[in-house]
Regions:
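Generic hydrophobic, amphipathic alpha-helix propensity
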Residues: 6-14, 31, 56-60, 64, ...
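N-terminal intrinsically disordered/low-complexity leader segments
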Residues: 1-5
């Protein structure tokens, strides 16, 4: 098995375990079994569990960032439609497992932000990168006349992230996409629809 494939298998098994059980309840042994690789392979790629967890988080953030770039930066689509399409993609992914897993970044924020400063700082960087992308798209919507010029797009992007993460958490708790639909209805039907 190639080195790249082995590392990828470990990272994917880690993501699966963290989403299903959380970071603290995920054991290296069970991750190795899931990946089908020997124990020595783990320490070849990762210094310890925290290093592994951060690499899993980085891989997840990289994948989400790529999806955000594709969906939120496609200037052939109106800005608000891009945001709606992005939320639709995330909603579909969450519904595919009956909303049981939630968002890895949100989950790890709740679990690790007060346990590891390294995790907390990295999670905040990821959230800030998401806010940056939302704000850029919302600014384009504002320029296009889709959003009120009176709104502070950075503040709106922060509100978007905070509200969306809350909706994802509630969807996980309820095992229902209803909170996601409520978020979209209120955001697009009330907050973003007010133009001056």
């Amino acid at each position: 098995m190639s080195k790249v494939k082995t590392k990828d298998l470990l990272l994917e098994a880690g993501k699966k375990s963290f989403l299903e059980k959380g970071y603290n309840n995920s054991g290296i042994e069970s991750i190795l079994q899931e990946a089908g690789v020997p124990k020595g392979s783990f320490y070849h790629y990762f210094e310890n569990k925290e290093d592994f967890g951060l690499k899993v988080l980085d891989r997840f953030a990289e994948c989400i960032g790529e999806r955000q770039e594709v969906l939120l930066c496609d200037e052939s689509v109106p800005p608000l439609e891009r945001l709606r399409n992005y939320c639709g993609m995330v909603s579909d992914a969450l519904r595919s497992d009956e909303c049981r897993k939630g968002c890895l970044v949100g989950n790890l924020s709740q679990e690790m932000a007060d346990q590891s400063e390294v995790f907390r700082a990295r999670l905040e960087e990821i959230f800030e990168s998401w806010v940056d992308r939302y704000a850029a798209c919302l600014k384009q919507a504002q320029v296009a006349g889709e959003v009120s010029p009176d709104l502070d797009v950075r503040e709106l992007a922060e509100f978007w992230l905070n509200s969306w993460q809350g909706a994802v958490l509630r969807a996980k708790t309820m095992r229902s996409p209803a909170p996601l639909h409520t978020f979209l209805d209120v955001m697009f039907g009330n907050i973003l629809s007010v133009r001056r």
